[in-house]
């Protein structure tokens, strides 16, 4: 599995990458939203973890760009400022919202759910 983390907090990216790599997940990260979008065009990722509040682009906006190129992209939105309005935004882009700080177990369980949901949909779509 390949994951791209896009968050303007370098320390958060490094810690999250180390956690996921410790579980055998291939991880790349960037602190630049548009740079992350460019990375997604160059190589495929199974999952994107996006911070909502970044300097040049909101994570929810970035999710829309990513889904234009890959409608089945699996995306987790994160924020230290999660509220009901952001929850509504996350639902509107069909992405779960994780409120920072969150534990590794919670993230790993969410990743498992997203991947199993995607496998179920692909099995249903086959004739």
What feature does the model see in each segment?
Residues 31-35, 58-62:
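Acidic catalytic/metal-coordinating carboxylates
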Residues 54:
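Receiver (REC) domain active-site loop signature in two-component systems and cognate sites
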Residues 24-31, 39:
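Short hydrophobic/Thr-rich beta-strand motif most characteristic of the beta2 strand and flanking loop
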Residues 51:
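Active-site residues of response regulator receiver
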Residues 102-112, 119:
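C-terminal output helix
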